[in-house]
Each structure stands twice: as structure tokens, then as C-alpha cells.
């Protein structure tokens, strides 16, 4: 009986996904120790409110254990745009990253969003994904905080920038999603395609966390194989299974981030191309964005 005949492919439950994330990061941190002693990413939210307490601008980011920040969302109410509010909230989040000791910030933006804006703030493009989704380009940009960098100086705006709550993070995300929907054609809800391989004793020996977004882009979020079972093709089997299912659901492209120099060769062997490389994150290593057209 072959190895594959001894294993069963099953759908993953939520508890499986949480365990998968923990196992992936345990492995990562065994290779590259944490810089910040935090168990989960630290959420940073800055907002600007009007006299009635309504949020009119906001920016959110996440600080990671390897001394980096990912800026997730930035939004300004349409009535208040081009008045410096976005820059004020954005720079307030950047300031937190600097004060916490982060050495790099990175972020993503589509072609209809704010690439020129980020370039003016001293960011550099390191990854470009074409037709992602179809008809659009996706950019990833970065700024080093441990080296000299350029950017706009803060300007007076007539409003105070204050800390936001978790509820404010959700609100800012919802508002940005509403803006994005004016430019993107959602085809369906997000489709989870999380799978696991289980041995005869019921032990999970490999798993993938993946899915197809509303705009028909497939994402591989996490992939893990138990050390005892590595080198036997289980990771490739899960990736191929996901690719097949994603294509059946309408995906035209598969992308993945959080690919590092210790696992990039696996993706290259499975015919993924490198869209971009963020050097020296984590320190002394590289993070990659990869893709495959279906």
C-alpha cells in the first residue's frame, strides 16, 4: 500500500485552520526567531472623526513578530478627500511602526486605488500582478524605516487623529470594500477550499488553507506538512487539488504571499512564478509573492 493509499483527504474545520496557522508559525519561528515577543499580530488603527463623532478617515495596520508592519486599509470619506486627512491618518500609523521598532512597512494597492499616492510617500513597488483580477493590476510596495527615506511632511488638517477600536477597524474595512466594489465585479462570496490529509489513526499530517475570492482570484494562505511526512509529495498533492477546485469555481489565477526563501523552491517546482521579492524581511531573508495562471 502506497503512502497516499494510507491517507484520506478531508475538508478542514475551523479548529483545523487555527491549528494549521499555529504549526506554520512555529516552524517559521524555529528558522527565524521573533524580534518582537508577541503571540499574534498587533493591530494599529488611527481615525479622524467629525464634530458628530462620525469617522471620516482612517488607516489600519498590523505589526508582526519579525519587526514589520503591513498596512491593510486606508479610507477617506468622499466629502473630505484631497484635504490631507488620509495622509494624516496614514502617517500616524507609520509613526507607530517607527516607535515600535519596525524596520519595514509594506502594503498592497490596485491600479484604481492609490499607487501614485504611496510613491509620493516614499514607497517603492516590489511586486506587480497583472490581470489580478482580470482587467486590473495589483501592486505591493514597501518602505524601509531603518534607512533614510523620503515622504510628505505632515500638514495641518483642522482635525485630531485618534486611536481607533476593533469596531473602527471593521468600519474602515467595510467602507473601503464599498469603494472597491465600484471598480471590481464580484462574482460570488468567498469560497473556502481548506483541506487536510489524515492518516489511519485520525492524525492530520498535512493541510492547506486556501480559497477563491469574490473576484475569482485563488489564494493559498497557509500550507503545512508534518515533518515525518515531508518529501513525499503531500504538499504538491494539496496544492494540485486546490488548483483543480479553484479552476472549477472560476479562478483565473492563484497567488500566495508569505512565501520565504526556505519554501520558495517548492512553489517554483510546482510552476509558480515570482511576482516580487521583499528583501530583508525577516532580517537577512526574503519574502516572496508568487502566482500561477490557470
Q: What is the predicted function of each stretch?
A:
Residues 54-62, 68-75, 203-211, 217-224:
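Conserved beta-strand in the GNAT
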Residues 62, 132, 211-212, 281:
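A generic structural motif
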Residues 82-95, 120, 231-244, 269:
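Conserved acetyl-CoA-binding loop-helix of GNAT-fold acetyltransferases
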Residues 1-15, 143-165:
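Conserved N-terminal entry element of GNAT/NAT acetyltransferase domains
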Residues 21-52, 60, 170-204, 209:
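Active-site rim helix/loop that mediates acceptor-substrate recognition in acyltransferases
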Residues 97-111, 246-259:
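Conserved GNAT acetyl-CoA-binding A-motif
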Residues 106-108, 119, 124-142, 255-257, ...:
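Conserved catalytic-core motifs of GNAT/GCN5-like acyltransferases
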Residues 74-82, 223-231:
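A short, internal acetyl-CoA/4′-phosphopantetheine-binding micro-motif in the GNAT/acyltransferase core
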